[in-house]
A protein has these predicted regions:
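Short, aliphatic-rich beta-strand segments
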Residues: 297, 303-313, 372-376
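Core structural elements
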Residues: 183, 289-302
Length: 551
């Protein structure tokens, strides 16, 4: 009787559990369409945004996302301008001839969000390839969203986007200059990076491991599981290198890329080939084990010098110099090989735990706008040298320097634009300001290396520095500014209004935040005189833009 009561009790408990499970399934089914659509939209935007971040190369690690739009009644005029400009730019996300539908009730989004959503919307309904260029993994890796669009159409669409974005801020005298495209818009990225990770078990090792497991199982069965086995080597796995798939950390193997320098790509593949010989394990970011995390190759456009940085999960690197010599033997273009240590569980590629040269001087030199620049693993240097020279020369031209002016280079970084300006006219005085001490150290070294004496570099917040200059009654003729993707802060723009430079030349990698800031400067008494886009990253939706303003 006790057993029967126990069985009835157990049966009742099972029935209750089944009923509860059915109720949960029904509840999930009711919510499923709404939840799926919402999460899908978020996923698409996230994937597109990650792909877009990848296309902007040298900027992506140093620049942060724009702050979210203000929605409260008490938001500042500065935040309101951001929303107004996003609405004015409403429909530029799609690739030329592409179709991207806007969801009903969707808020106006920033230019980068629209571009990301446009790319994420590609798939079965992607525009037909009309450029004659193709890549077997272009839809998977997301590095070249517009590869199938003829280059002339890409330029025309980017030009139209800038005219529509800045049109409301212009007057009848504002010059909309034609976009500066590339003559040869392929293989232009002179900084190429690849992660290294373990892939599938090599087939012959898989078969060998299966046989070992079977033998161990048979032995264990014979002695009741008491047999202990010696530790054996793990089966070998493929080594993956290439690009991350859009919005993921899944590596898409690529032996060639139409955007990346071919020498750099060949070196990355040579590293993969040498790793088994030197027993170098690729880093597994899930297990947090392995040794080689990334390799970064920088190629000097004018000099042809090559810097290879190996990012390792630990300092101890047995046979490191032999590895470097063998790599140089296979790729004689290499000038120097550097080991950078990063043991942190982070998405940051380069570490700050130590660095040493395994071969060569540990840096390379390259020429830009007639000046020589020293480039190390941590140096900021634009990834498209051809268009960088165009960008800087146009910016200095728009500054209209005739001699004797005082120029303030805000967000100066390693001093490239300021040095070009200092070298462009007689008796020009240039002051470069940046809050990153290491960048200022590089800027001073670049000035000394080039013998440029009419420039000084200061470690300070640019906005605070300008406010102090205004308080002392000092005068600036021209302000050069190249802020991060988030644009200038409200405090910085107030400082510009207080200092009142006669001319402002604003370089931006994010025209949406640039338009917002230009609108604020316009309210402070400045007039937009010229807009000049530069196509720094062909076959992507990204646009670099220069605005000139006069007060």
């Amino acid at each position: 009787m006790a057993d029967e009561a126990k069985q009835r009790k157990t049966s009742t408990a099972h029935e209750k559990a089944k009923a509860a499970a059915r109720a949960k399934r029904l509840e999930r089914a009711k919510r499923k369409p709404k939840t799926k659509a919402k999460s899908g939209a978020k996923k698409a935007t996230a994937q597109g945004g990650a792909a877009l971040s990848k296309t902007t190369g040298g900027h992506d690690a140093a620049r942060s996302k724009a702050p979210a739009k203000g929605r409260n009644a008490g938001r500042t005029a500065f935040e309101g301008q951001r929303e107004k400009q996003a609405k004015a730019a409403g429909k530029h996300g799609a690739a030329p001839s592409g179709t991207v539908k806007k969801q009903a009730g969707a808020r106006s989004r920033s230019l980068d969000e629209r571009e990301a959503a446009a790319f994420a919307g590609f798939g079965e309904d992607a525009p037909a390839n009309r450029s004659g260029l193709s890549c077997p993994v272009e839809r998977a890796c997301g590095a070249c969203q517009l590869l199938g669009v003829p280059y002339a159409e890409q330029l025309a669409d980017k030009q139209r986007r800038m005219e529509e974005l800045f049109g409301p801020l212009a007057d009848e005298k504002t010059a909309f200059c034609p976009i500066e495209g590339m003559e040869s818009p392929l293989y232009y990225r002179n900084k190429v990076m690849s992660p290294y990770a373990p892939g599938r078990v090599i087939p012959q090792d898989r078969a060998r491991e299966d046989m070992r497991r079977a033998d161990r199982g048979n032995e264990a069965a014979r002695d009741g599981g008491r047999t202990r086995h010696d530790r054996r080597e793990k089966p070998r796995r493929e080594i993956l290198c290439g690009m991350y798939a859009a919005g993921t950390h899944r590596i898409i193997p690529t032996d060639e890329c139409l955007l990346e320098n071919q020498t750099a790509k060949r070196i990355l593949l040579a590293i993969r080939q040498l790793m088994p010989k030197f027993r170098i394990e690729p880093y597994d970011e899930d297990a947090l084990e392995g040794f080689l995390r990334h390799a970064i190759v920088r190629v000097g456009h004018e000099s042809g010098e090559v810097l290879v940085t190996l990012v390792t999960n630990g300092e101890r690197f047995p046979g490191s110099r032999n590895f470097a010599r063998e790599l140089v033997k296979r790729c004689p273009e290499i000038t120097t090989v550097v080991q950078n240590v990063n043991t942190q569980n982070t998405n940051a590629v380069l570490g700050h735990e130590g660095e040493r040269a395994l071969y060569g001087p540990g840096f390379i030199l390259d020429t830009l706008c007639g000046l020589s620049f020293r480039i190390s693993s941590h140096s900021f240097y634009q990834v498209n040298a051809v268009q960088t020279e165009v960008l800087y020369r146009r910016a200095v031209e728009m500054a209209c320097l005739s001699g004797g002016e005082t120029v303030l280079d805000a967000y100066c970084g390693t001093g490239t634009i300021g040095l070009v300006a200092a070298n462009s006219a007689a008796d020009v005085r240039v002051i470069g300001v940046d809050n990153v001490a290491s960048a200022i150290a590089d800027a001073r070294e670049n000035a000394a290396h080039n013998g440029v004496e009419n420039v000084e570099f200061v470690t300070a917040d640019a906005g605070a520095f300008m406010r102090e200059m205004a308080a002392r009654g000092e005068h600036v003729d021209v302000l050069l500014m190249d802020p991060p993707r988030a644009g200038a802060s409200e405090e910085f723009l107030r400082a510009v209004a207080a200092l009142k430079p006669r001319r402002v030349v604003y370089i931006s990698c994010n025209p949406d935040t640039q338009a917002r800031d230009v609108s604020v400067l316009k309210d402070a008494g400045y007039r937009l005189t010229a807009v000049r886009p530069v196509d720094m990253f062909p076959h992507t939706a990204h646009v670099e833009n220069i605005c000139a303003l006069e007060g």
